[in-house]
Amino acid sequence: MSLHSSLDPKAFGRVAVLFGGKSAEREVSLKSGNAVLSALQAAGVDAFGIDVGDDFLQRLASEKIDRAFIVLHGRGGEDGSMQGLLECAGIPYTGSGILASALAMDKLRTKQVWHSLGLPTPRHAVLTSQADCEAAAAELGFPLIVKPAHEGSSIGMAKVESVEALIAAWQDAARYDSQVLVEQWIAGPEYTVAVLRGEVLPPIGLGTPHSFYDYDAKYLADDTQYRIPCGLSAEKEAELKELTARACEAVGTQGWARADVMQDASGQFWLLEVNTVPGMTDHSLVPMAARAAGLDFQQLVLAILADSVEARG
């Protein structure tokens, strides 16, 4: 399948770009959604935006909508609930379906699926109490990374190097999610790899002076480094792309997605997570990877939208 869309922009009909929502990633979604909306309108698509709120069901019933471009990050938009609602309404939409969206949003279940298939992912534990923190420290050792199981954009994440810091980080992460994970820290370079219409795009190497690629490094900092080409040998880059393809296939992603991967000192890659509605801001990674593959931002959003026609009519 070609990365480029050959469809006339008018063939998409009236497109609702869904963004905002109520998740902790609302501000990122607003930026992503407005960027997508502007690009679609500039391309000649009959697109309009909906900031998804309490009146969304009324908007859905009252507006003429031929298809939806989902740019909702986090819970309520990326977790299968919006996908299920649109399925019930008979409205085709971009990206992954209900099951893959729900699975990818749940970091614990995603890791369990990968582990069952023999795909490498860091050792982990679930934290529900101070005793869990102490047991995880004894089993996994330090340093560790703490993360809410159902949040994105590195919200609520922290790197810790003591039991006391682990307990504090667990308590902080629990403000965002009732399920908190702690993972073995993988020391080494981080890569992110996008998949678009079944094709793995050029990997991006990430560098930051922060202790890890956190929210500030992703969206605010000007000192974050992005390497395209990623700096790997041809053989290791091919291995990384193949691992990403297998990881996304295991989850069942569709249309577009992005996987985050670490590499340890021995050269081993470790899967962290998959995002089914990646960011589309001026700092975002999928647009960077698409540019490296020869697609500008407008061509990228048209390709994502075209997949909704080919996959869902």
Swiss-Prot record:
UniProt KW keywords: ATP-binding, Cell shape, Cell wall biogenesis/degradation, Cytoplasm, Ligase, Magnesium, Manganese, Metal-binding, Nucleotide-binding, Peptidoglycan synthesis
Residues at which ATP binds: 137-192
Predominant localisation class: cytoplasm
Molecular function via GO: ATP binding; D-alanine-D-alanine ligase activity; metal ion binding
Binding site for Mg(2+) 1: 260, 273
Domain ATP-grasp: 111-306
Pfam families named in the record: Dala_Dala_lig_C, Dala_Dala_lig_N
Cofactor(s) the record lists: Mg(2+); Mn(2+)
EC number assigned by the record: 6.3.2.4
Name of this protein: D-alanine--D-alanine ligase
Gene behind this protein: ddl
